[in-house]
Amino acid sequence: MLGPLVVLASWSSIDERVKEFHVALLLLQTAMLGAICSIDLLLFYVFFEAMLVPMYLLIGVWGSTERQAAAMKFFLYTLVGSLLMLIAILAVYFLAGQGGARSFDYASIYNGMLGANHEIAQCLAAKTCDTGIFSGSFHNEQLSPMAVALLRYGPWMFFAFALAFAIKVPMFPVHTWLPLAHVQAPVAGSMILAAVMLKMGTFGFWRFAVPFFPAMARMYQPLIATLAVIGIVYGAFMCLAQTDIKKLIAYSSVSHLGYCMLGMFAFTGEGATGSAYQMLNHGVSTGALFMLFGFLYERRHDRLMSSFGGIAKVMPVFTAFFVIVTFSSIAVPGTNGFIGEFLVLLGSFKSNLPLALSIAATTAVVLGAAYMLWMVQKVFFGQLTHEANRSLKDLGRREVFATLPFLALILVMGLKPQFILDVLNPSSQKYIARAAYGADADTSKVHITVRTLGPAVAEAAQPHLLVPGAIAFPSLQARDR
């Protein structure tokens, strides 16, 4: 869906090298689809790296005044992380191939390491081995050679995968390339970067890092969850300090994607489902914010909040659309953002993570509302103090058509989320099972349901937590471990 909308949103903003621009868009789409669909680790790496070139061109050729520096910083950051991942992929290839034919096939590698992960799970349960510094304190005779190798070198392989994906997310403190890239990128680059490309990082954790190294993921769980919460709070405070609208939206991505990582590393059914839902939410909401600001930038060629004020008087349709998307971004009940953040926070509170992390993440929701509503008030309301704003034209037909699909998704995903949750639940069940040291965990109670209020809810036997927006969340009893 995003590809045609990106073309529609950029229709009048790109007037140089138009053919090359669309070629770069198509190449980027191909690379992203290839990375998502790959069931071969080496092929995944090729597509994961191939994304860099067209995005580098989108920023470096069609970006703003500092586009070269932004493009180079983006390229170098992600390249360094990816090279470490390549080393880890080769290590996994040789490790999983012990005693059999070596392959980069996902299923072959996962199944090849499954037995070793089972051994490690039993060893850890019996406390005869450790996932700490690996000083040789475990009993080698109890483990197969593959399990010993995985226990000894697995943390470094997990770290290599995790660093590559953390840069792509991006997580604090390897996030510094993102604000500059977003600010300098054209509207198409920002939309694709926010809506899809950043999710390659969270997708990588979900599909590769945690399933291949469940014990190591548990070992790093406190660190990654802490960095996720730091990113949530840090991103919110950085947004409060911004005067550049596009940079504010960019830092909000750091905060929102922190919720995705927190839910993923809560290792609960609610957290996993909420994390996946939040990935979709961020793509819809932040992609729409960048697109709408791109429409405004085409008219004024200015990114500072102080250059606007009172434009709701001259652009009422644009204002209404922007406010709806803002409500989605701050997780107002009835919008898509509420479902994802609620499930993530619920999963975090039910997990074994320190309570302080869950409280800090919950507090940051208020900060998110503060910086977004502050920006809306500064830009759209008050007096028309700048003469240039009086002649601004409201959205045209093309721009309205490009925005309506985003608005529809915001409302449908917020009011009727069950059809998406039904799709996400099986993946969440598999993720929780694979995170349980590769063991066959009981995931029968991982299924998450959200029902519209009605007679059936009143008759339900389970207690329900009722929240605004005509939504009921049935209580979930499982720890999902």
Name each model-derived stretch.
Residues 4, 30, 80, 205, ...:
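Hydrophobic residues within the alpha-helical transmembrane core of Major Facilitator Superfamily
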Residues 17-141, 238-251, 257-305:
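Alpha-helical multi-pass transmembrane bundles of energy-transducing inner-membrane proteins
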